[in-house]
């Protein structure tokens, strides 16, 4: 029983996070065994005895390793003993701590994810000590820690590791620069990580990363050059950060400034990036999993592994950026042997196809495609490996028969990237792509390119694009021997040089488009237009193994040649599908729609289809109708210029909504009755297959109502939000979420149309859009000065209402994180709505001078047009006053003092007086009239602080009249009498402004029970006192250099204190 109990206790590890079902492996048992052994050896010994005993024990190799691991265990699990243990291990180690470093390296590489939170923090502490004392081989531990700093992960645990490593590198910069490989790995890693830290919440970390990385690149550029072409790929993703933009300027226009041996960007692009750097951007665990998938899983059985991988590593929006890292790793690092190529193991192209086709983020998808074809662009058969270009051609070749959408998007991307990646050196890029295709044919990676390039399943536009870019590869195979190889042949002179000569580059602008080097992230809109985002079912069928046997077979040219070259892609797909018998009610109309593919036949089919119940269809019949319908609707939408060129001409407006998809909207607009289940299913599939359907519906209703109203001026046609709700229900999403997503997509697609629809959105979706910060942010990010002007016009005319008074303050509170330009635009729009100050003034105490200058500037202008009130003064004086004061409060008080001096003085005095108990102990204290009791009421110290800083801002007596009024004098006297010594000393100069006579009289007059204080009506004596006070104040501020204001105030306070004491004695 005791053995069992001890066994259970031993299972609780301080080093590793273990659950009840976890079994210890050899590593965990080894660490805990060594720790327990060391504890038994040194328990109860003094430091001297322990050192003597361990010095003898480490002479034996086995014991030396156990003792080193035991010490390592203590340092990682016991922060309080870590420093002492580190000292002990330096005394007894006989290999310069090489054993500890080796075991720590292995621990980080294999078990980092299982380390406890304490162990992770202690690991950073230990690394810092190793680097500080320059322990040998510590760079191996650092490199493995860099690998654990994963891309696409913004969790707090990962950010802690990244920032900790960054701090070590910054602190021990000299040590870092002594190791060129670690410099290269660090720069490569942090340039990649910066891409993921675009969230405003990570701004401080990102700035630190950028500053460190840029300085390291510039100072050690000769070490950076070997990073090669993938380093350029990463730099493109951060090119819009100002510091990296300047680096791009120097790389493109002034390369010698970076290093004398650097000849320009083409030098980097021709260097193949080492596998070690590609490897360092994958977590060790991720590397093991993807390597297992590519080496041990049979083709057709991979789906469950891919599902696990998807859930594990692609669960967050930020993780999409990992796909590019994985594709570059698979292409450049995983090179299967001939035996594996001949086996039934899943090929690399299938894994890459799955990674690309399952990506739903358009920017990440574009970057993933670039990663696939990146080596093609600079391919040199003399230097580069054919294994780096093989996956790209195979994924297109094997997908063309059953899943042409995959091949189509990749072919389109290859054509466009060849021309647009580096416009200045388009001829060189084209040579690289031509060399790739030439070697692919020579090595028989595929038999020929005709089944791919001339497939009838490609639409006509794409086939024309292929002819323009790869004309030579469309000729018969016998002529292929004359193609371009490594040098520039007449092909260049005939095709390439003409295009490049006609293009004029304006290199003064550093914009990557102008320099010829494109940014993939910036071209994603065009990519989205040509890419079909597949459904989950399509992704499964492409790369899950259902068609594995078919894809293994090499297709003959005869199998793919048909007489339907000129048929549209959708008709080719329909032609391949077997004819399905449908119900008589829809058979004729559906055939007409498939044949004619226009709005008229589509609406006729919908009219027949809508009333049919579920019992009218078998499942395969409904699937047949839906799949073909979605395909035709998608194909008949224009690839470009989907919106009208004119917003007024009926001809252009009517043409822009003449496509079949708009026929669905028209049908829904004119038919309000409830739909049967098959129609709802059809609607759901259309929403899933056409993500743009939401904003296209909004666009349709705007134009349709406009055109119908012109035709029939007697009848008013209005937006029907019920149709949009129907679409949201079909997509199974809330209307607010759908509206936000659709507006975001629309703004990215066409800003002008977005702004054109904006008044209708705020009118028809009033409850959702008004005071909606997310929609507001979408609007503010895209508008310029002219757009702001137009919005203000619409607001002034009553056509647009963006804000309502209730809840506006919450909207403004969230907008404080917006960019400066966005906030200035916001405040102009708020001002156009004539929002009363009382609706937003409660935010004043929350605004900070350093963080919210835009809001404070606007409030200052607003307050200049207002009179001081009890409420606004209370809120202003509730603001925290820094050591140098609050310039905002001081500015407002100075301005108001010029116009409303007496009123301002009375309000502040009342507020200050209310902070102290009444002079009569039996009277219940009430707040002064007009002062509301609130949780944000300023304290006495806050009021005094603001008054003190206001006093300091006054020069030569200007503005000092605030203090001479009777209520202020009494308030200062009351504050003085109720303050402790510390407060009196702090505000001695302020208290000195209270007149001596008033102080004495006030004390005596207030000593009687029930004695009223002087009212607003002033007698002659009070008037004389005010004059006296004013003269005294002026004396204080205009004293000459020989007299010290502080000394005068102190003496004044002493005199006043004596008189008060005497007055007390007299009253007694």
UniProtKB/Swiss-Prot annotation:
Residues 916-939, 1001-1068 are annotated as: Disordered. One of its GO terms (cellular component) is cytoplasm. The keyword Cytoplasm applies. The modification Phosphoserine is found at residues 1038-1039, 1043-1044. The gene is IntS3. Keywords: Cytoplasm, Nucleus, Phosphoprotein. Belongs to the multiprotein complex Integrator, at least composed of IntS1, IntS2, IntS3, IntS4, omd/IntS5, IntS6, defl/IntS7, IntS8, IntS9, IntS10, IntS11, IntS12, asun/IntS13, IntS14 and IntS15. The core complex associates with protein phosphatase 2A subunits mts/PP2A and Pp2A-29B, to form the Integrator-PP2A (INTAC) complex. Pfam families: HEAT_Ints3_C (PF24566), Ints3_N (PF10189). Disulfide bonds: none annotated. It is found in: Nucleus; Cytoplasm. Belongs to the Integrator subunit 3 family. Component of the integrator complex, a multiprotein complex that terminates RNA polymerase II (Pol II) transcription in the promoter-proximal region of genes. The integrator complex provides a quality checkpoint during transcription elongation by driving premature transcription termination of transcripts that are unfavorably configured for transcriptional elongation: the complex terminates transcription by (1) catalyzing dephosphorylation of the C-terminal domain (CTD) of Pol II subunit Polr2A/Rbp1 and Spt5, and (2) degrading the exiting nascent RNA transcript via endonuclease activity. This is Integrator complex subunit 3 homolog. Its main location: nucleus. Transmembrane segments: none annotated.
């Amino acid at each position: 029983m005791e053995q069992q109990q001890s066994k259970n206790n031993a299972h609780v590890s301080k080093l590793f996070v273990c659950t009840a079902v976890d079994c210890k492996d050899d590593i965990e048992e080894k660490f805990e065994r060594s720790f327990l052994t060391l504890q038994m050896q040194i328990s109860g010994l003094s430091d001297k005895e322990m050192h003597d005993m361990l010095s003898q024990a480490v002479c034996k190799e086995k014991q030396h390793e156990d003792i080193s691991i035991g010490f390592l265990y203590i340092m990682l699990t016991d922060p309080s003993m870590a420093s002492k243990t580190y000292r002990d291990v330096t005394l007894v180690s006989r290999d310069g701590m090489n054993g500890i470093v080796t075991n720590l390296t292995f621990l980080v590489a294999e078990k980092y994810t299982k380390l406890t939170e304490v162990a992770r923090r202690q690991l950073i502490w230990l690394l810092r000590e190793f680097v500080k004392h320059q322990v040998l081989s510590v760079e191996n531990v650092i490199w493995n820690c860099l690998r654990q700093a994963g891309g696409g992960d913004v969790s707090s645990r990962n950010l802690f590791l990244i920032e900790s490593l960054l701090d070590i590198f910054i602190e021990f910069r000299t040590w870092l620069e002594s190791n060129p490989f670690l410099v290269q790995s660090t720069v490569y890693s942090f340039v990649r990580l910066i891409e993921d830290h675009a969230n405003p919440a990570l701004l401080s970390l990102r700035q630190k990363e950028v500053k460190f990385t840029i300085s390291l690149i510039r100072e050690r550029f000769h070490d950076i050059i070997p990073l090669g072409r993938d380093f350029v790929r990463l730099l493109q993703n951060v090119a819009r950060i100002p510091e990296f933009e300047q680096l791009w300027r120097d790389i493109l226009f002034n390369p010698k400034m970076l290093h004398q041996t650097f000849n320009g960007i083409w030098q980097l692009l021709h260097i193949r990036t080492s596998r070690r750097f590609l490897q360092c951007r994958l977590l060790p665990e991720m590397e093991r999993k993807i390597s297992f998938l590519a080496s041990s899983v049979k083709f057709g059985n991979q789906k469950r592994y891919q599902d696990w991988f998807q859930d594990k590593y692609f669960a967050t929006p930020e993780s999409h950026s990992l796909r590019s890292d994985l594709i570059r790793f698979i292409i450049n690092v995983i090179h299967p042997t001939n035996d594996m190529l001949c086996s039934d193991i899943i090929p690399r192209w299938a894994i890459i196809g799955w990674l690309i086709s399952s990506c739903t983020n358009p920017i990440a998808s574009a970057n993933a495609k670039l990663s696939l074809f990146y080596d093609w662009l600079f391919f040199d058969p003399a230097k580069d490996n054919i294994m780096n270009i093989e996956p790209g051609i195979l994924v297109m070749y094997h997908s063309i028969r059953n899943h042409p959408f995959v091949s189509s998007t990749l072919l389109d991307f290859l054509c466009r990237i060849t021309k647009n990646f580096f416009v200045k050196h388009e001829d060189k890029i084209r040579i690289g792509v031509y060399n790739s295709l030439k070697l692919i044919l020579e090595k028989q990676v595929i038999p020929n390119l005709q089944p791919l390039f001339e497939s009838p399943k490609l639409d006509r536009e794409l086939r024309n694009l292929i002819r323009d870019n790869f004309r030579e590869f469309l000729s018969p195979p016998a002529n292929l021997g004359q193609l371009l190889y490594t040098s520039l042949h007449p092909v260049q002179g005939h095709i390439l040089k003409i295009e490049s000569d006609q293009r004029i580059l304006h290199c003064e602008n550093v914009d990557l488009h102008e320099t010829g080097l494109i940014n993939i992230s910036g071209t994603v809109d065009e990519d989205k237009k040509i890419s079909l985002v597949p459904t989950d079912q399509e992704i499964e069928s492409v790369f899950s193994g259902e068609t594995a046997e078919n894809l293994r077979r090499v297709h003959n040219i005869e199998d793919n040649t048909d007489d339907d070259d000129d048929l549209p892609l959708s008709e080719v797909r329909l032609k391949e599908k077997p004819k399905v018998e449908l119900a008589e009610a829809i058979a004729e109309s559906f055939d007409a729609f498939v044949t004619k593919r226009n709005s008229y036949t589509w609406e006729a089919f919908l009219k027949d289809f809508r009333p049919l119940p579920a019992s009218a269809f078998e499942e395969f019949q409904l699937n047949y109708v839906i799949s073909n319908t979605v395909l035709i609707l998608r194909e008949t939408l224009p690839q470009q210029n989907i919106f009208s060129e004119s917003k007024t001409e009926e001809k252009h407006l009517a043409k822009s909504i003449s496509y079949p998809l708009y026929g669905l909207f028209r049908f829904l607009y004119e038919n309000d009755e409830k739909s049967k289940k098959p129609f709802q299913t059809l609607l759901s599939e259309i929403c899933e297959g056409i993500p743009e359907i939401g904003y296209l519906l909004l666009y349709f209703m705007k134009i349709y109502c406009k055109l119908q109203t012109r035709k029939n001026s007697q009848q008013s046609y209005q937006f029907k939000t019920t149709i949009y709700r129907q679409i949201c229900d079909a997509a199974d999403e809330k209307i607010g979420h759908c509206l936000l997503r659709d507006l975001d997509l629309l703004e990215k697609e066409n800003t002008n149309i977005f702004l054109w629809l904006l008044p209708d959105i705020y009118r028809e979706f009033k409850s959702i859009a008004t005071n909606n910060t997310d929609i507001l942010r979408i609007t503010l990010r895209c508008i310029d000065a002219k757009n702001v002007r137009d919005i203000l016009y619409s607001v002034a005319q009553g056509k647009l209402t963006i804000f309502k008074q209730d809840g506006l303050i919450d909207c403004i509170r969230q907008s404080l994180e917006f960019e400066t330009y966005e906030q200035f635009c916001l405040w102009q729009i708020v001002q156009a709505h004539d929002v009363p100050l009382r609706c937003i003034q409660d935010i004043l105490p929350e605004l900070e001078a350093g963080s919210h200058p835009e809001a404070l500037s606007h409030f200052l202008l607003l307050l200049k047009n207002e009179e001081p009130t009890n409420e606004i003064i209370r809120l202003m004086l509730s603001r925290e006053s820094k050591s140098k004061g609050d310039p905002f409060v001081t500015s407002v008080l100075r301005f108001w003092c010029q116009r409303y001096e007496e009123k301002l003085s009375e309000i502040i005095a009342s507020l200050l007086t209310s902070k102290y108990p009444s002079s009569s102990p039996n009277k219940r204290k009430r707040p002064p009239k007009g002062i509301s009791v609130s949780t944000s009421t300023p304290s006495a110290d806050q009021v005094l602080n603001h008054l003190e800083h206001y006093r300091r801002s006054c020069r030569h007596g200007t503005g000092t009249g605030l203090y001479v009024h009777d209520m202020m004098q009494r308030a200062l006297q009351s504050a003085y009498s109720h303050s402790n010594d510390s407060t009196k000393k702090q505000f001695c100069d302020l208290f000195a402004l209270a007149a001596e006579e008033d102080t004495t009289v006030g004390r005596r007059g207030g000593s009687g029970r029930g004695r009223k204080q002087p009212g607003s009506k002033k007698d002659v004596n009070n008037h004389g006192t005010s004059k006296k006070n004013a003269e005294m104040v002026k004396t204080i501020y205009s004293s000459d250099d020989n007299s010290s204001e502080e000394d005068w105030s102190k003496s004044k306070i002493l005199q006043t204190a004596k008189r008060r004491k005497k007055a007390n004695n007299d009253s007694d």
